[in-house]
Structure formats: C-alpha cells, structure tokens
Amino acid sequence: MMAKIVSGDDVIVIAGSDKGKIGKVVKILRKGGHVVAKVAGVALCRKSVKPSKDREGGIFSVERFIDISNIALFDSEAGVRTKVGYKFVDGKKVRYLKGSGRVLD
C-alpha cells in the first residue's frame, strides 16, 4: 500500500478520540498491507513499567500507533489540512502540497 505521508510530516488527526490534534509523524510501519503511524503527542496511553537495573519503574505515557486513514497532511503555513501530490522538478520526482503548491521534498 502506498502512503503519501512520511516521517517528519506535520499531520492532523481527522477521526477518533484525538480528532483535531496536530503533531509530527515520528514513525511509519508498513507491514502486511496495513500502514500505521506514530504521531508525537497524539493517542497517548499509560504504560506500567517494572523497575530494572537500567531505569526506574513507574507509570509512563507512550504514543500508540494510529491507522494512516485517520490522519491527513497539515499545511502549517496555511493552517489547513491538505492533500499531497507528486510532480517532476528538474527531472526529479518531488512531493508537493496541492492546496498551496509548496514543495515538501
């Protein structure tokens, strides 16, 4: 499955309990025909960790993965969500925002 969102992109959550939150993509997993993304500060859950030699135990907040269909690319300059397209610039394929025409790569 082709996903037009990559690590480092600004995205907005468009469905679920965190709808409307904006964050940066930390990690993308593409396995088994399923694409999920981890977004900084979104879809937080609490995880209990036992103490070990290396670190202290306790309850920590960690980010869960979100399905790629529940997020959309966010244009930080215009302040709106937008779609991404591909075009050739100087013989090189680049991603661009369809709303503003700004080149991402």
From Swiss-Prot:
GO terms for molecular function: rRNA binding; structural constituent of ribosome. InterPro entries: KOW (IPR005824), Rib_uL2_dom2 (IPR014722), Ribosomal_uL24 (IPR003256), Ribosomal_uL24_CS (IPR005825), Ribosomal_uL24_KOW (IPR041988), Translation_prot_SH3-like_sf (IPR008991). The keyword Ribosomal protein applies. GO terms for biological process: translation. GO terms for cellular component: ribonucleoprotein complex; ribosome. One of two assembly initiator proteins, it binds directly to the 5'-end of the 23S rRNA, where it nucleates assembly of the 50S subunit. NCBIfam families: rplX_bact. Belongs to the universal ribosomal protein uL24 family. This is Large ribosomal subunit protein uL24. It comes from Anaplasma marginale (strain St. Maries). The lineage of its organism: Bacteria, Pseudomonadati, Pseudomonadota, Alphaproteobacteria, Rickettsiales.
